Structures are given as structure tokens and as C-alpha cells.
A protein has these predicted regions:
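C-terminal active-site subregion of NodB/CE4 polysaccharide deacetylases
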Residues: 1-61, 67-70, 138-236
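Histidine-centered catalytic micro-motifs
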Residues: 4, 125-133
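Acidic (Asp/Glu)-rich catalytic clusters
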Residues: 32, 75-82, 109-128, 182
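Alpha-helical scaffolding within the catalytic cores
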Residues: 45, 71-72, 102-121, 149-150
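A short, conserved beta-to-alpha structural element at the edge of catalytic cores
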Residues: 47, 81-103
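Acidic/aromatic-lined carbohydrate-recognition and catalytic surfaces
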Residues: 54-58, 62-82, 89-93
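Short, catalytically relevant binding-site loops at active-site mouths
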Residues: 91-94, 132-134, 172-173
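Surface-exposed cleft-lining segments at the edges of enzyme active sites
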Residues: 95-107, 134-141
């Protein structure tokens, strides 16, 4: 799970979710050198169901839909032929990360529709990260449905393609939220719970490995090739 690939804004106090382009390139090389097969998210669900028996599978996801995905991450993914999924905050496409405190996280540009359409033509897939990136558990039932369901409707209308996967903002979810995600027509949802994907995992509580600026080469390799990351706990 990535957020930003690039340099943080000068005013940004919290820089943990930024990975340098050089480090991202190295990490993609590590996936190839370690014998991993990078697959679309649907194949991860097939692995969970037991329909795929290849053990060294990986999927690459990006939360929020920042412009630096297109500028810095996508060229590397294209070079390696790796698929990836970007989870978009649908009502803020082309704007900035208005959900974050500007003095802590800074203001960062989100991709506009023209860029998203270009990436779609290149095979990048998109998922939903709600309309405005709220803490879903703090919303009224009506507002929760609006954030989850209408984000899917908006994205499918603009992309002219199914939006099948959801990602919980801040890793904030409960049984009520999961039920709304299911009822909205998604086939799977991704958390910020750190860990490896196992057979028989719940399709709507899929864990991920958070890649940060502190994820040095040794840690990255450990996460790929061992249970080091499999701690089964929540992170933002």
C-alpha cells in the first residue's frame, strides 16, 4: 500500500507516507528479483478462494489518487509491466487532499479526470476511497451510504467501467460499514491492517503492507519473503 511517490511539500510536517522515486524503483526491482508475480486485485481474491495456487503473488495499490502517481510511479510500473489499482476520492478528483490538516500533511494535488482517463487506457484500474475521505464510523447511516455507494456510482459513470473494489479511509470500518460496502455492489474491500493475505481471508477485510519512507531495503525484502509484516493490527 502506497500513498505518495515523490518529495513532500515544503510545509509538510508528517512525511512518513512519502517514498522517493529512487526507492520505489528499487522496490519494484525487488519484486521481480524475488520471483513475485504482480497481479490485478481480482487474482488476489482468487488466491483467497483457493482458485490460484501460486504462492508468490503481489498486488500494488495506491490510496487517494495523487498526481505523483502519474508523474513518478506509473512510468516505473509501465517499465516492469506491473498492473496496479488506485483508490480515488471521487468528489475531490482534480483538487487537493482537503481531508488532511494543511500544517501537518501539506496540500497535495490529486489527479484530474483527464489524467485518470489516460491511465485507464493504459490498463491502470481504479477503486473507490469514498466521496470525501471521512471517518466512516463517525457518519450518520445516510451519510455513510452516500460516501460508499455514490462514490461507486460517480466513478463508474465517469470511467465507463465497473468499480469493484473499495478501500476504507484511515482503515476505519466495522460490521455496519462492511455491510454497506457489500450492499453497494463491491466485490472486495481493502484495509490498512498490516499483514499478508491468507487463504480464507474475508473479502471485505483484506490486509495490506504499508510502505513508508522508513521502509528500507531490508524491511521491504523481509515483508516480501517472511511473516515479518503479518502482525494483524490496524494502522492509518
Amino acid at each position: 500500500m502506497y500513498h505518495n511517490v515523490g518529495a513532500p511539500p515544503r510545509e509538510t510536517a508528517f512525511r512518513g507516507l512519502y517514498v522517493t522515486p529512487h526507492m520505489f524503483t528499487f522496490q519494484m526491482w525487488c519484486l521481480k528479483a524475488s520471483g513475485f508475480k504482480v497481479v490485478p486485485l481480482k487474482e488476489i481474491l482468487s488466491f483467497v478462494k483457493g482458485d490460484i495456487f501460486h504462492e508468490n503473488l503481489a498486488s500494488i495499490t495506491f490510496d487517494d489518487g495523487y498526481q505523483d502517481f502519474y508523474d513518478n510511479a506509473y512510468p516505473v510500473l509501465k517499465e516492469y509491466g506491473y498492473p496496479s489499482t488506485v483508490f480515488l476520492v471521487s468528489n475531490l478528483v482534480g483538487k487537493e487532499n482537503l481531508w488532511d490538516h494543511p500544517k501537518i500533511h501539506g496540500r497535495k494535488k490529486l489527479m484530474d479526470w483527464e489524467t485518470i482517463f489516460r491511465l485507464r487506457e493504459e490498463g491502470i484500474t481504479f477503486g473507490s476511497h469514498t466521496m470525501t475521505h471521512p471517518f466512516l464510523s463517525k457518519l450518520s447511516p445516510m451519510d455513510m451510504v452516500d460516501e460508499i455507494k455514490n462514490s461507486k456510482v460517480l466513478l463508474e459513470s465517469r470511467l465507463q467501467a465497473p468499480v469493484e473494489f473499495f478501500c476504507y479511509p484511515y482503515g476505519d470500518y466495522n460490521n455496519e460499514i462492511i455491510n454497506v460496502v457489500k450492499e453497494s455492489g463491491y466485490i472486495g474491500a481493502f484495509t490498512t491492517r498490516r499483514g499478508l493475505v491468507h487463504r480464507d481471508d474475508d473479502f471485505f477485510e483484506i490486509p495490506r503492507s504499508l510502505i513508508r519512507n522508513s521502509t528500507n531495503p531490508l524491511l521491504f525484502v523481509l515483508r516480501l519473503c517472511s511473516n515479518y509484516e503479518d502482525r494483524r493490527k490496524r494502522t492509518k
